[in-house]
Every structure is written in C-alpha cells, then in structure tokens.
Amino acid sequence: MNKKVIYFLCTGNSCRSQMAEGWGKKYLGDEWDVYSAGIEAHGVNPNAVKAMKEIGIDISEQTSDTIDQELLQKADLVVTLCGHAADVCPATPSNKERVHWGFDDPAKAEGTDEEKWAVFRRVRDEIGKRIKTFAETGK
C-alpha cells in the first residue's frame, strides 16, 4: 500500500513545522510519509529539538529545507502552520487538499528565558494535540 504524503509548511522550517514533522512521524507514520519545509530555511531551532526531546521525540537529524516543488505536487495534504506561509505559500494543485492550522511562533516569544521556554513547550503540545486529533479523526 502506498502511503499518502503530508507536507507541513511554515515560514522558516525552524520550529513549528519541524515539531509537526516529529509529531507527524509519531502519530501518522503508518499511513503517511511526513515532510516539512519553509518559505525560507532558517535551520532547526535548538529549542525545538530540546522541547521535542523532552517528550521522547528526536528531531535532531531533521533538516531545515525550503519548499520542494516536486514534493508539493506529490503531497496529498499540505498543512500551513503560520500566517506567513498561508499568505505566501506557492499555489498547490487543485486536486490537493490544503489546510491551515495556526500556531504562535515560539522563536518570537518574548520575556525571560523561562517564559520563552514555556512558549516552546505550549506550542509543542498544541501541535501534538492537533496532529493526534487528525490521526484519530482524519480532520
């Protein structure tokens, strides 16, 4: 059986889409090939790696990539995770489903180190919950 392809997109492929790829591989890996990319490639944020490691998901080997047009064409579902990607995302083929799941950008969190870290954990958990719901309901 061929797996479907899900493609998580955000602005820099640094935090949200990286965490989504990690969660996606955990919850969707049996039925979906899971990828992520960004309008730009900012490198994987070390705090995203740390936040995911804290809950037992290793994303340290994932790479920060710009959107691959061939993969975009192959994708069965494109999920944008932030406003910028939703606005600037390349056109997707009309037969491809595209949805937007908005999450705060933890890299832009302000405050003390402790407050910034709390945002990474919150966004990590929100993304995980959303992907788990999708895995269970298809929505």
Curated annotation (Swiss-Prot):
The alphabetized list of GO BP terms reads: response to arsenic-containing substance
SUPFAM superfamilies to which the protein is assigned, alphabetical: Phosphotyrosine protein phosphatases I
The record lists the catalysed reaction(s) as: arsenate + [thioredoxin]-dithiol + H(+) = arsenite + [thioredoxin]-disulfide + H2O
Sorted alphabetically, the keyword list is: Arsenical resistance, Cytoplasm, Disulfide bond, Oxidoreductase, Redox-active center
What the entry lists under Pfam families is as follows:
LMWPc
Going by the record, the broad EC class of this enzyme is oxidoreductase
Disulfide pairs here are C10-C82, C82-C89
Under the cellular component aspect of Gene Ontology, which terms does the record hold?
Answer: cytoplasm
In short, the EC number is 1.20.4.4
- Active site at which residues? C10 (nucleophile), C82 (nucleophile), C89 (nucleophile)
Coiled-coil residues are none
Query: InterPro entries of this UniProt entry?
Result: Arsenate_reductase_ArsC (IPR014064), Ptyr_pPase (IPR023485), Ptyr_pPase_sf (IPR036196)
The family annotation for this protein states: Belongs to the low molecular weight phosphotyrosine protein phosphatase family. Thioredoxin-coupled ArsC subfamily.
The protein's name in its UniProt record: Arsenate reductase
